């Protein structure tokens, strides 16, 4: 980062996955995953909150809904923890892209720092967050919702471009030994979280 290398961060701050859901109970406990990146990203002006985005505009999953003879009947259900996000930004990185499927996405909070930030992708206006730790069950596909549940909660950033001169995480810290290659501040750079 200090030498000008561009960075793409694909970070899961919540431990949850579809493969874990396909167990005997169809339930998992979504919990925070500590990655030790919080301080660095906070210094650069963003915070990935340990929450899950639940969106009405989501991709379907197929679940067994019964049997017809010896054949298992499969039915598609909307899985609200897998938002299907259409880019609305005019930034060249996402301009003209089709919908993008996320699984167990976490919202990004934008903080006031010197680094320029551009929201590349955000959830729909019919989305909200679910705190962690929280049980997630396949039975949630049958939940009924109303637009009032999402009022004022949507449009959550899930991808952000940061541009500028990033300071080292170790700036103003005592180094264990003298390092002639240490840079307190980097060159103009970009990173996507």
Regions found by a protein language model. Give the residues of each.
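Acidic, S/T/G-rich, low-cysteine, solvent-exposed domains in lumenal/extracellular/periplasmic regions
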Residues: 1-193
């Amino acid at each position: 980062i200090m030498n000008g290398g561009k960075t793409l961060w694909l970070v899961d701050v919540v431990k949850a996955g579809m493969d874990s859901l396909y167990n005997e109970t169809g339930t998992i406990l979504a919990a925070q995953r500590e990655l030790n990146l919080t301080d660095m990203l906070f210094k650069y002006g963003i915070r990935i909150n340990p929450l899950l985005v639940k969106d009405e505009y989501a991709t379907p999953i197929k679940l067994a809904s019964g049997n017809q003879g010896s054949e298992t009947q499969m039915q598609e259900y909307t899985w609200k923890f897998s938002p299907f996000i259409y880019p609305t930004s005019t930034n060249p990185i996402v301009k003209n892209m089709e919908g993008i499927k996320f699984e167990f996405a976490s919202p990004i909070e934008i903080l006031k720092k010197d680094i320029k930030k551009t929201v590349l992708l955000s959830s729909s206006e019919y989305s909200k967050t679910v705190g962690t730790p929280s049980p997630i069950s396949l039975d949630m596909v049958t939940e009924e919702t109303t637009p009032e549940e999402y009022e004022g909660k949507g449009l959550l950033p899930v991808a952000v471009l940061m541009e500028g001169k990033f300071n080292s995480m170790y700036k103003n810290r005592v180094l264990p030994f003298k390092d002639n290659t240490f840079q307190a501040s980097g060159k103009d750079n970009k990173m996507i979280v």
